[in-house]
Amino acid sequence: MSTNFEIVRRQANQDLELFHVAERAVVPSRANGRGIDLHKLTHEETIKLVRRVFFSGATTPQVVVFSGIEHGSGCSWVCARTAQVLAAHVESPVCLVEANLRFPSLHRYFETVVPGDASNLWLLSHGAKQADRQATAGLDRLQSQVSDLRANFAHILIDAPPINAYADAVLLAGIADGLVMIVEANNTPREAAMRAKEVVDAAGIRLLGAVLNKRTFPIPERLYRKL
């Protein structure tokens, strides 16, 4: 990792803070406050997603944006899980970026790394909820940092706000290598999915895959085309 890594840390200090986190992530349980071990959940399905998104083509995308269609799709969970599995299968550094600044949650999924841990997973996160004006300014600063992140990490996964709610996901995907769309199984209206697809297509964004949350596997391309 180059010396630019320290520059990224200093630039992010006031808005987004960079943490070295343990590869084994946890999801807080709303019922009892305990963590649920992500490692035991949908491991095989997530490996398939990692292979499809990052290793199925002639070129490997370095920066990938994850975005749901609407609020409540579980995008942050899918993005966190994908980053954890990816980091466990590569030796190069992986950075998970919190770009959903209005409703940040990634910081709840990971524990800070302990001394001597060989984890190659990093989290660029903001733990406090921001108002629209602050989130817009934070997005601008994050966009300016993408080139530094590219110089320091082999893989960057960005958790973005919903496509149909804000323009953030499309703006970030425009400077990334592609987008993964999260669809909530049995709950996302067909019209909402169609509207999100039209937004992505109109912006010329490369769609790397779509994921049905709660099933967590890529939708075959032939089915996605029917959305």
Segments and roles (model prediction):
Residues E23-L41, I47, R51, F55-A58, ...:
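P-loop/Walker-type NTP enzyme "switch/lid" segment
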Residues R81, V85:
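Active-site signature of alpha/beta-hydrolase-fold catalytic machinery across serine-
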